[in-house]
Structure formats: C-alpha cells, structure tokens
Curated annotation (Swiss-Prot):
GO biological process: chaperone-mediated protein complex assembly; protein folding
Native organism: Caenorhabditis elegans
Function: Co-chaperone for hsp90/daf-21. Involved in regulation of longevity, larval entry and exit from the dauer stage of development and response to environmental cues, such as oxidative stress, in a temperature-dependent manner. Role in daf-16 and hsf-1 inhibition at elevated temperatures.
Gene name, Swiss-Prot/TrEMBL: daf-41
Domain named CS: residues: 2-89
One Gene Ontology CC term in the entry: myofibril
Disruption phenotype: Resistant to oxidative and heat stress. At increased temperatures, there is increased longevity and an increased propensity of larvae to form dauer. At decreased temperatures, lifespan is shorter. Defective chemotaxis in response to toxins.
A molecular function GO annotation: protein-folding chaperone binding
Tissue: Expressed in anterior and posterior neurons including ASE, AWC, ASI and ADL amphids and phasmid sensory neurons, peripheral neurons and ventral cord motorneurons. Additionally expressed in body wall muscle, pharynx, vulva, germ cells and intestine.
InterPro entries: CS_dom, HSP20-like_chaperone, p23-like
Name assigned to this protein: Co-chaperone protein daf-41
Amino acid sequence: MAKQPTVLWAQRESLVYLTIEVDEAKIEELKGEGNKLHFQGSSKTDKYEATLEFFDEIDPASVKHTGSSTRVVEITVQKKTPAWWPRLLQNKGKVHWLKVDFGKWKDEDEDDEAEDAGAGIGGGMANGFDLNQYMSQMGGAGGADFGGLEDDEEDDDMPDLEDNEEEEGKNGTRA
C-alpha cells in the first residue's frame, strides 16, 4: 500500500505552491483535472500517493514540478479563477499530512504580483535572492560581538551565597 506523504502548501491569488515530502522518489504520475491533483511516486523502499481535492478548480495544463531532490517534489498549480482561497482543500476538516509552508506563505494583503514574477519554485525571492541559500551560508560566520559583557565590576558588591547560608543556619530559619 502506498504511503500518504506530507504536503506543504502556500498560495498567491493566482497560484498554489505545493511541496511533497518524499525520500528520493521518482515521479510516476502527476495529473491535474477539475479541482483535483493526483501524485504518485516511488523510491527504492516506498511508494507514495496523494490526491488533493482543492477548494476550487485549477488549470490542469499549468501543473509544473521540479525534479525531485533528495527529499521533496515542488509543484506549482495555477488557479482557474484568481482568488484567495480560505483553505486548500474542499473538505473543511483537518488532515494530519497537510501543513502550511510558512517559508512561501504570503498574506492576502501582502500580495504583490511584481514580487512574484521573480520568485522561483525553489523558495527564491524577487531579484533572484534566495533566503534559504543565504541562511545556509551563515553557518560558520560566527556570532555578534558582545564585547564588554563578560564580567561587570558591579557584581562584586553581591554577597556570596555561602555566607548567607551560614547566617541562616545560625539563626535557625530559612527564607
């Protein structure tokens, strides 16, 4: 039996971004029709299958995907009628395998088609800037310099904790 992969999604007024989390899977079928999208793929050890029944109709000819990387298949789907959907699926219930892709999410009031024109399917941003690539390069850059925060002479005025415990023992009381 095929496994249901985790699907991440984000939308713009005229399109939907989908990221299907699969482990080194080969795409065997990717088909859009009406308000449905069907994905089927397999890896060396597992078979994956997902059928999404969208909130509204899509343009089946516009379904595009990147070749699967080691972990994900990224898909873009044009909406037949540009409009913000209140949810991705027609069914109002929650499904455990569907999550919001906050890396690509944009609120309705933030939408600017000019920015989207330069956005790539792989999470790229306008003008070719890819935040994911930038962040991966930050790994060995070191942190900010917080000079002067090591020892503060004001701390010398504080009494030692041991002195307080000895005094409490003499008085026979504890705070």
